[in-house]
Amino acid sequence: MPRSIKKGPFVDPHLQKKVLEASASQSRRPIKTWSRRSMVVPEMIGLTIAVHNGRQHVPILVTENMVGHKLGEFSPTRTFKGHVANKKSR
């Protein structure tokens, strides 16, 4: 169920502060965050945000198409190795 429109998008306060500082200083360094639950807002466009996936920080360049999605959607937590082939059927 999506968040109520009257509440607005959720962005962790510490991440919002870092985004505003980076956009004001035109910094190109990635912003590290563990907040996968934060929503991508228009202030983040053009910034690189390193989102933690449980093992490492995955750098993500935020574009206009990402606005309204959560940061965790762009940093997969599971790696699919593929199904094991059945050697008996061959």
Swiss-Prot record:
GO terms for molecular function: rRNA binding; structural constituent of ribosome. Keywords: Ribonucleoprotein, Ribosomal protein, RNA-binding, rRNA-binding. One of its GO terms (cellular component) is cytoplasm. It comes from the Bacteria. GO terms for biological process: ribosomal small subunit assembly; translation. InterPro entries: Ribosomal_uS19, Ribosomal_uS19_bac-type, Ribosomal_uS19_CS, Ribosomal_uS19_SF. Belongs to the universal ribosomal protein uS19 family. Protein S19 forms a complex with S13 that binds strongly to the 16S ribosomal RNA. PANTHER family: RIBOSOMAL PROTEIN S19P FAMILY MEMBER, SMALL RIBOSOMAL SUBUNIT PROTEIN US19M. This is Small ribosomal subunit protein uS19. It comes from Nitrosococcus oceani (strain ATCC 19707 / BCRC 17464 / JCM 30415 / NCIMB 11848 / C-107). The gene is rpsS.
